[in-house]
């Protein structure tokens, strides 16, 4: 096991101090995370294939509904506090034992509320999911999913604590354990218990991962803080800190639905299909790179106090991320029609031009992402919220104007780019003023030259 510092931070697997934040560390952290993510995705595909072959369309659809319920409850009831936990642990704002105690208390309280819903209200949840004609057939299954979502909530906090400790390999291993356990159990649960097995399967993998993750955290925690006192304060602490982030998650959903409604009103379902295809590809592209990096960048930034050291790390993170994203952005731009045809069909090739325009925003989005991690790691949630709300306002207002003036669906993609350009300017201003961050000449020149090259590739 790695040693724990007085602040509760665990040593990195490679080297301590600034070496840990070297370019080599970025490569190692990203390489391992993306490999684990690929394996986890592959195991998920295997699980879905087993469900589709031996369960058929009906059980596949049922599993999809149960997964939405499970994910919605566990993510929604976390109130965005997982980011707060990462910041607490990585910065030493609270000791590891205190953070574990507060998170444990919160999970216990929410678990109790979920138990009440599972016992007394599952029929109403089933009606909301399936309607009255089918609800009575799945009351028991819904109760199981509602109750098991407490395990999902606990796993969110386990992952957050380990992310705060920069335990990249441990987090990846837990995700692999969850995915492999689900894949191994899929055939037995689906063929033996049908719909009830589908309900069990949704949270099955997380049970195994939680056992391992909980055991690891228990070994890392020093001291024996009781989890029997201060329950109300624990909930108040987490919810008050994370409610703003939870509100932003809700805002993101509202923006997505609103923009889709505006596009549908202006360009019909065909236009919505093209816009959704391009947006899905561009957002997935960003997620594939940023999700693995987040487990390393966010907690490492949280452990940096002095602005010069923080600025050095931000510049290094930005340079590495740009070098990683840039060639892939050019490939996405050049192969967009092949990608669209492979993922969808020839009927969606009209989304190619939309995707090309949205690719222009990849470099600004990359810079913005790194600056956003710096703000979150410093606990500047209100500042982060201002930038997110500003971008959401531009997207909704801009799309409304585009549809009102009948400028064409391509203009929607340009609104997307404009929103991220404004977002970048705001993030830069806040980062300089509130964090005293300074992007060096190398980072600025790299971002500007890559933006220019992507633009030239688009125009050619």
Language-model features, listed with the residues they occupy:
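Signature of the first transmembrane helix
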Residues: 2, 21-86, 110-119, 148, ...
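Interhelical loop/hinge segments that connect adjacent transmembrane helices in multipass membrane
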Residues: 6-26, 138, 213-256, 296-312, ...
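Membrane-water interface segments that mark the loop-to-transmembrane alpha-helix transition
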Residues: 25-40, 66, 75-126, 136, ...
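Membrane-interface "helix-start" segments
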Residues: 29-32, 140-144, 170, 225-229, ...
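Helix-loop junctions and terminal segments of transmembrane helices
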Residues: 77-94, 164, 278, 282-322, ...
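Membrane-interface junctions at transmembrane-helix termini in multi-pass inner-membrane proteins
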Residues: 88, 150-173, 359-390, 431-435
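Interfacial segments at transmembrane-helix termini and the short loops linking adjacent helices
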Residues: 122-145, 315, 323, 332-363, ...
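Hydrophobic alpha-helical transmembrane segments
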Residues: 139-143, 172-221, 237, 279, ...
